[in-house]
């Protein structure tokens, strides 16, 4: 499983670097898209928490407000997040990942409620959830790259 966490860490480093390089358009929604660069990044954090923690019956380390703003099917609201909120999301890219790896290694995820993804896969274990989450975040990183072309 270490490789799965390493892959996710690299994807998130790439996302953070991309966000920093594109600060001036992080909240723009390009023509043909429904969401911004920032929304896609925050959405990845929320989805990881839902897939790994909520579906395993464990407490998420993010608050419900973040979930409500960035879960699947949402769109950016009218106001730009505050500097504090942006910093929190940047921090969560790695703190949420580090906590997931720690919790996995400590055997926290003993139960898992099967979940059918919109991708067409049914997840039945934490290992499958982590693997799928990597696919999901790779897709969203691809969206980020396409948004600035």
Where are these regions (language model features)?
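Intrinsically disordered, low-complexity regions
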Residues: 1, 13-18, 23, 83, ...
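Short, helix-capping/interhelical loops that line the mouth of catalytic, cofactor-
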Residues: 1-3, 49-99, 103, 110-114, ...
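Short, contiguous alpha-helical
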Residues: 5-9, 16, 25-72, 115-149
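Hydrophobic alpha-helical core bundles mediating ligand binding, dimerization, or RNAP-core interactions
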Residues: 8, 12-15, 19, 93, ...
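Surface-exposed helix-capping loop/turn segments at secondary-structure junctions
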Residues: 21-27, 102-113, 149
């Amino acid at each position: 499983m270490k490789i799965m966490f390493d892959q996710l860490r690299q994807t998130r480093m790439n996302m953070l670097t991309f966000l920093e390089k594109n600060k001036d358009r992080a909240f723009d929604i390009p023509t043909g898209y429904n969401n911004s660069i920032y929304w896609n990044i925050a959405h990845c954090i929320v989805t990881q928490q839902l897939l790994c923690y909520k579906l395993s019956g464990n407490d998420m380390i993010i608050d419900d407000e973040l979930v409500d703003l960035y879960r699947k099917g949402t769109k950016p609201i009218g106001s730009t997040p505050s500097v504090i909120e942006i910093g929190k999301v940047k921090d969560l890219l790695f703190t949420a990942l580090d906590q997931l790896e720690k919790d996995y290694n400590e055997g926290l995820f003993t139960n898992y409620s099967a979940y059918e993804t919109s991708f067409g896969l049914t997840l039945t274990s934490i290992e499958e959830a982590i693997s799928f989450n990597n696919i999901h975040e790779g897709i969203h990183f691809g969206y980020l790259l396409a948004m600035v072309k």
